[in-house]
Amino acid sequence: VVGCAQRPGIDFDQTHCSTLKSTSLRFLAATAAIQGLHMRRYDFVSAILQDDLEPGEQIVCRLLPGHETLGQDGNNKVWRVLIPIYGMQQGGRRWQRSLFLWTRSLGLTQCDTDNYVFSMTTADDALVWVAMSTTSSSSTSKMAPTHCYASFTRELTRRWELEDEGEVANLLNIGIARQGTSIKLNQSA
């Protein structure tokens, strides 16, 4: 589906990929400050490239300028896309689908008001919040007691190639600074 050729009520869902709401980020930062939770940030390396197309799905794209565009039979040549790629209208949506399925498989519950927020209460009654963003930086921020952090990071690295960026300092272009028991948010460019 080409983004500019979508039809209302028919194929809008094939390319749309939402992101974490800024109000959710503010709520989670306030919760972390009040409860003394840790906030971590992960960057998924080449996030969209770590996904697969749906079974039976075939996507083709035109050749880049400068390549022979006609085959010997006179028909236009196209490339068949084997995995989602950046710039592909469906890429972010495919990544989102896989990430959500994986997160729910860990036992986290998806929030009703923001698709990018998940929560879980562990066996020892520790509350785990996971907030994700599938923007160009494709990062996830985890807020939980320290012992949950190691387990969650282990599960993440088992499934995805990622970098642990430590304490979250910026998400959705919002600066996040912890000062003792408070967390300050500021708009950063």
Where do the protein language model's features map onto the residues?
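Long, low-complexity, charge-biased intrinsically disordered regions
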Residues: V1-A189
